[in-house]
Amino acid sequence: MARYRHSRSRSRSRYRRRRRRRRSRYRSRRRRYRRSRRRRRRGRRRRGYSRRRYSRRGRRRY
């Protein structure tokens, strides 16, 4: 029983830490997306190029 209890607390702390990290990641991603959206609206001519570059960068990072 003690052994099970220990593993349970361990997994719980791990999940908590993971969740916190994920939240910050999502927040930064959302902010970045908002910025890119604004930039896209302004520059219509360079839309394809900027989009391609941004998607490539995002895929590599995340």
Curated annotation (Swiss-Prot):
Residues 1-62 are annotated as: Disordered. InterPro entries: Protamine_P1. Protamines substitute for histones in the chromatin of sperm during the haploid phase of spermatogenesis. They compact sperm DNA into a highly condensed, stable and inactive complex. This is Sperm protamine P1. PROSITE patterns: PROTAMINE_P1. One of its GO terms (molecular function) is DNA binding. Keywords: Chromosome, Developmental protein, Differentiation, DNA condensation, DNA-binding, Nucleosome core, Nucleus, Spermatogenesis. GO terms for cellular component: nucleosome; nucleus. Testis. It is found in: Nucleus; Chromosome. Signal peptide: none annotated. It comes from Trichosurus vulpecula. GO terms for biological process: chromosome condensation; sperm DNA condensation. Belongs to the protamine P1 family.
